[in-house]
Amino acid sequence: MKRQGTVIVGLTGQTGAGKSTLSRMFADRGAAVIDADQVARETMEHKLVLADLVLAFSTEVINPDATLNRKRLAQICFGDRQKLRRLNEVVYPYIVREIEDRIDRAAKAGARMVLLDAPTLYE
């Protein structure tokens, strides 16, 4: 995929396959690297996402300090396929939008290549 003269490369693979090492090598050579897992972690703390998670799963998923209670969300979702599907329906659009925004910013900043490190790129 190209965006305004910027080549976008997707990097996927299992845990321990060397994605982080390869990402660092690309970054050392001037590529902008986007870590989809990191984007997801950051995005899950946005107020709009938190509000949507409360609507989907109740206030149980929010800590008293208004941050995401990741442990409780995991307990709710990771043993129930329907709830996991619902979690993905809620957060996926926000994550994709944030990744697209970061790609656009990198392209506008003159990046010739963006490496998207996304372990679940094909799901």
Region locations from a protein language model:
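Active-site phosphate/pyrophosphate-handling residues
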Residues: T21, K71-R72, P119
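ATP-dependent small-molecule kinase phosphotransfer cores
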Residues: Q38, E42-M113
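Active-site proximal helix/loop that lines the substrate pocket
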Residues: G16, R41, E123
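Short secondary-structure boundary/capping segments
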Residues: M1, R105-A106, E123
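Switch II (G3) loop of P-loop NTPases
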Residues: M113-E123
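Walker A (P-loop) phosphate-binding motif
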Residues: K2-Q38
